[in-house]
């Protein structure tokens, strides 16, 4: 198994506080599974494709994409990986699909 950082996350300060862009990690397994952990924001699609190419891969070679959470900087490039199985925590998916009247605090979701 090989683990390689394809895109390095970048935090930065705005007038609203600290924000940032996610790190994208490639996990190339010995059994021909190629897994991405998060896939970055749409604005870095070209850089992600170039990083995959440097690693000897194309988007079609990715078999799985693990999404840590559904923020724009973690899911923006999902359309590049239409052949991949998408893996996401059930609680994250259910939370994202709630109407505003059903939203819970982060503390409630943690327990």
Give the location of each predicted region.
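Zn-dependent metallo-beta-lactamase
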Residues: 1-32
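Surface-exposed, flexible loop/turn segments at secondary-structure boundaries
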Residues: 11, 73, 94
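Short, well-ordered secondary-structure micro-motifs
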Residues: 16, 78, 97-99
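Short, surface-exposed connector motifs at secondary-structure boundaries
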Residues: 30-34, 56-59
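Short hydrophobic beta-strand that contains or immediately precedes a catalytic carboxylate
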Residues: 36-38
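Active-site metal-binding motif and surrounding structural segment of the metallo-beta-lactamase
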Residues: 45-88
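Metallo-beta-lactamase
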Residues: 88-111
């Amino acid at each position: 198994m090989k683990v390689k950082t394809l895109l390095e996350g970048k935090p930065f300060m705005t007038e609203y506080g600290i924000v940032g862009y996610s790190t994208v990690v490639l996990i190339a397994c010995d059994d021909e599974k190629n897994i991405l952990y998060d896939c970055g924001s749409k604005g870095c699609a070209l850089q992600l494709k170039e990083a995959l190419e440097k690693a000897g891969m194309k988007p079609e070679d990715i078999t799985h994409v693990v999404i840590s959470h559904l923020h724009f900087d973690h899911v923006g490039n999902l359309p590049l990986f239409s052949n991949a199985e998408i893996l996401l925590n059930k609680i994250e998916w259910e939370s994202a699909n709630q109407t505003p009247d059903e939203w819970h605090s982060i503390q409630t979701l943690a327990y």
